[in-house]
Amino acid sequence: FSRRQSLDSKAVQMNSLVLSMGELLQRSLNESIQFEMRLDEKLWVAEADPNQLESALLNLVINARDAMPEGGKLVVETSNQVLHREFTVAYPNLEPGDYVMLSVTDNGCGMPQSVISRAFDPFFTTKPIGQGTGLGLSMIYGFSKQSRGHVSIDSEVDQGTTVRLY
């Protein structure tokens, strides 16, 4: 499931986009969550739809918040990444090359492999009824594919989760 949306791709200064959302992201969290931004000062320009990127970042931050009901630490990070053929060969349509990475890391409840393997499925959610549609990650997956990028999840139960968007 990755319904194609019309994308308005353009050159995006990722750090500027993240900083412009800082207040909104902070307000999305509760006081028990420490919020940190680690933005690479020499970040390359990304090619993406800025509105879809904002939506993706907000979704990831809300998911991270929900994984830390008792509080914790949430980090939004940007960095330059070179994806080599050894990595991209496992992902059809992902070309080797230079990418800007946006990641959201939390030290919340984490996810077992059985959840990670279904996380991008539409309507799949582990949240209580009425608290999640199960569409956030599937929309991010569709956006990343349509943008010729990639999204990955690294998670450990009781340790936390990092979602990386390239």
Protein language model annotation of sequence segments:
Residues 1-166:
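Core catalytic ATP-binding domain of two-component histidine kinases
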